[in-house]
């Protein structure tokens, strides 16, 4: 693992450590990033190893939080992501934090976060990711019509591509399906599949089920 694979801003954070420690932490962070999709448990182990050497670095706590999130360890993810924010992380973590609240059975808190001042300052993909979580929170509460309202925005542009667009279209399709609007749901699952250039959803399988 080459520490130079880390983003420059993270390397700057690690510059407060002695060289040997910084190099070891960097290698663990690189490994965590590379493993996060295929083996999140291994990624979490690397992130925790980095934290054991440098628990006061925001990027390290963020890495632990993201890995824990991918493992479904909502409590640990929430604690670590909040710690990263307190330490000055500039990453857009609000959607992850809100989704952890959902995972812990607190959809009301997720919805509250999505209504806050910080949420109002988000734009682009970051705003869409939080919108998806907020809609999921409404659905958790059985408020499916309200979930659809949250997702019904100009961002539902069928010409968009990428993972966030694919997830947004997928969430919209799933909500339509929950309302019994199957034909419309099929169209949006098709759009999700077309937008999903990175394979983050199972939209193609959902299309097969509905077609």
Report residues per predicted region.
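Structural register within alpha-helical repeat arrays
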Residues: 31, 63-64, 97, 134, ...
